[in-house]
Amino acid sequence: MIQFTKMHGLGNDFMVVDGVTQNVFFSPEQIRRLADRNFGIGFDQLLLVEPPYDPDLDFHYRIFNADGGEVENCGNGARCFARFVRNKGLTNKNKIRVSTSAGKMTLRLERDGTVTVNMGVPVLDPSQIPFKAKKAEKTYLLQTPQQTFLCGAASMGNPHCVLDVEDVANANVAEIGALLTKHERFPRGVNVGFMQVVNSGHIKLRVYERGAAETLACGTGACAAVVVGQIQGKLDQQVRVDLPGGTLTINWEGEGKPLWMTGPAQHVYDGQIQL
């Protein structure tokens, strides 16, 4: 039997598994079955806690989408990861350092129960996002057979394009998201953010995630939106980001500096499952 915990960060929900004290392996097919909301546990991502590869770090953090594919990073998941390892007694630290396939992250448990995550320095060089463009720009034109879109692009360990919208509540997220997530200029696919700027310290955001469709919240998407908004001169250093599942606070001092994201991490239940 495998012990697991169901958690969520703003409704972005996870199956979290301790791979430190348990010997676990999940095939893509098993992950797809477990992710099914009718026949399985149901989740957006599976988070796996593994022992660190580097003695200076506390854990290795792996993320699998509901389609079974492994991805580089998940900000909402990182907050749940921090709360999980602390709740399960895998560490007694308030500041936790982890590696992911995209690099290293620092997670900080706050006194009010929220978790602050150092999301790293955003990548703006198109070749590193990866995104097909001659050079880094504030905005890019994305052409599709139906229409042309203006977007910003950045990577937070995973690729994002961000569109400015007048009214996020009525944005055609499902259709445009599905169209752009597989756009040929993003060789590894892309997460698509729909950003409404309320004022320079406040945005509303919906995100169509690569491999998962629209989710209630996307931490890396919130970071990417703030980066794009700041570069375009629309946003301040600290920004409140309202997502369908709740609110995150993002702090960024500008190019070359890491982003800090603060938000909740909720425990839902503990369970066990036979694979």
Curated annotation (Swiss-Prot):
Site (Important for dimerization): 269
UniProt keyword list: Amino-acid biosynthesis, Cytoplasm, Isomerase, Lysine biosynthesis
Chain residues that bind substrate: 12, 45, 65, 75-76, 158, 191, 209-210, 219-220
Enzyme Commission no: 5.1.1.7
Subcellular localization: Cytoplasm
Domain of life: Bacteria
A GO cellular component annotation in the UniProt record: cytosol
A Pfam cross-reference name: DAP_epimerase
Site (Could be important to modulate the pK values of the two catalytic cysteine residues): 160, 209
Major localization listed first in the record, in broad terms: cytoplasm
Catalytic activity of the protein: (2S,6S)-2,6-diaminopimelate = meso-2,6-diaminopimelate
SUPFAM superfamilies recorded: Diaminopimelate epimerase-like
GO biological process, one term: lysine biosynthetic process via diaminopimelate
GO molecular function, one term: diaminopimelate epimerase activity
Functional pathway: Amino-acid biosynthesis; L-lysine biosynthesis via DAP pathway; DL-2,6-diaminopimelate from LL-2,6-diaminopimelate: step 1/1
InterPro entries cross-referenced by the UniProt entry: DAP_epimerase_AS (IPR018510), DAP_epimerase_DapF (IPR001653)
Active site residues according to the UniProt entry: 74, 218
Assembly and binders: Homodimer.
Membership in a protein family: Belongs to the diaminopimelate epimerase family.
Protein task: Catalyzes the stereoinversion of LL-2,6-diaminopimelate (L,L-DAP) to meso-diaminopimelate (meso-DAP), a precursor of L-lysine and an essential component of the bacterial peptidoglycan.
UniProt name for this protein: Diaminopimelate epimerase
Organism: Shewanella sp. (strain ANA-3)
